[in-house]
Regions:
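Amphipathic alpha-helical segments used for helix-helix packing
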Residues: 110-132, 180-185
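Short hydrophobic clusters on alpha-helical segments that form packing/core surfaces
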Residues: 26-34, 106, 206
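N-terminal intrinsically disordered/low-complexity leader segments
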Residues: 1-21, 85-88, 214-220
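Amphipathic C-terminal alpha-helical segment
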Residues: 3, 108-112, 143, 148, ...
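Helix-turn-helix
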Residues: 25, 33-67, 71-72
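Hydrophobic alpha-helical connector segments
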Residues: 84-115, 167-171, 199
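Amphipathic alpha-helical packing segments from all-alpha helical-bundle domains
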Residues: 112, 119, 129-156, 165-166, ...
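Generic hydrophobic, amphipathic alpha-helix propensity
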Residues: 22-30, 47, 72-76, 80, ...
Length: 220
């Protein structure tokens, strides 16, 4: 009869995650909870269970769910700027590339982190204090950039005279609606098109509608 293998000594057991790794894991799992249930519907017990630790262990990293929620939104605020690679294209007036890259950046950021859109919606609906800085730094900045671009290109004669702010909202609205339908309502099978196809279609519809017509140029 063979002997029962001895358990691994402590030095050979699976190492515990480092503090920074555990903190990142908590934020990642908490984002999933908040994105599904909102702030009010999520408890520290829910988060600890997702991470696989006790509530007492969770409190070693964060004093409560308010701190976790704020850390998640603060992390999203500090994420890479979507506009940085688009600004040179805008300076050169490369309309199709500007709108295509903007649409792709929005789609890919949400597809890579599905909790992002849900968190933003819940933060606004629940009136969380972090919702305002998130909106100002990420959402409003994007809309203002596009508003200024449409206004400039209209002045240059490339676009017809539309309200720039409404034009910006119309374009962003197409993309965001697509993301909400897929990520919030779960209709991925109904809209399985890859990001490149989605962006190209929306950009064509938008630019065909906003492009200056010959009579607009003559009047200008």
């Amino acid at each position: 009869m063979s002997a029962t293998p001895n358990p691994l000594p402590p030095s050979e057991a699976r190492p515990r995650p480092r503090a920074d790794e555990r903190r990142a894991q908590i934020l990642r799992e908490a984002a999933g909870c908040f994105g599904t249930r909102g702030f009010a519907g999520t408890t520290t017990r829910d988060i600890a269970g997702r991470v696989g630790i006790t509530e007492a262990a969770l409190y070693r990293y964060f004093p409560g769910k308010e701190a976790i929620y704020a850390a998640i939104l603060d992390e999203r605020i500090g994420s890479p700027d979507l506009l940085e690679p688009i600004e040179p294209l805008a300076a050169a007036g490369r309309d199709r590339e500007v709108f295509t890259e903007l649409a792709l950046a929005l789609i890919r950021s949400v597809e890579a982190d599905p909790s992002l859109l849900r968190l933003l919606l819940y933060a606004g609906l629940e009136g969380h204090e972090m919702a305002h800085p998130f909106h100002e730094r990420r959402v409003r900045r994007l809309r203002d950039f596009l508003t200024r671009y449409i206004a400039r290109r209209s002045h240059e004669g490339a676009f017809r005279g539309v309200d720039p702010s409404l034009g910006a909202r119309a374009f962003i609205g197409m993309v965001v609606d697509h993301l909400i339908v897929r990520q919030v309502f779960g209709q991925r099978d109904e809209y399985p098109q890859p990001p490149d196809q989605v962006a190209a279609t929306f950009v064509s519809i938008f630019l065909d509608g906003i492009a200056a017509r010959a009579e607009d140029r003559r009047d200008g």
